[in-house]
Amino acid sequence: MHDYVIWVREVPGVSRAWAWDAWHGPGTVGLAWLYDDRENIVPTREDLKTMEQYLFCHKHPATGVMVGKPGGIEVWPVQVRLKKVSISIRLTPDSLANRSAVRANLTALQKTLAPGQTLPVSSLRTAIGMTSGITDYFLNIGEDTTSDVDELITIGEVTWLTA
């Protein structure tokens, strides 16, 4: 599985990748990847074609030797569905700088998540509470957020509450 993740990450623009063994039974691999620097981070049809060609056969970046998926292995691209979690936050003290810093921490947190992973409310609280300058906050979410195996939790709209 590790080779597939490495190969996918070698393709320009790919920022995150995951692989699952026996996705549709023996001899199959499920493969998902994202492009975090794009507005729409999910692969397009063209991205899927490019990836299929790259996985079939490409030059190893360090050695120049041709490598690719072994014969008999069927790779299934997994189209990750984004599960946006919208949240409401009230910060003390409330400022544009604090809001930007909290948003940056939430973005960093979402990039640690994998498809099918649960987002613990404690992780949201840590991302907010560890922001320098924040002395208190309110968060409207009180429970962990779960996802299906092909869903990836992302931070959706943040509503900034005022006192």
Annotate each PLM feature:
Residues 1-119:
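Carbohydrate-recognition loop of C-type lectin domains
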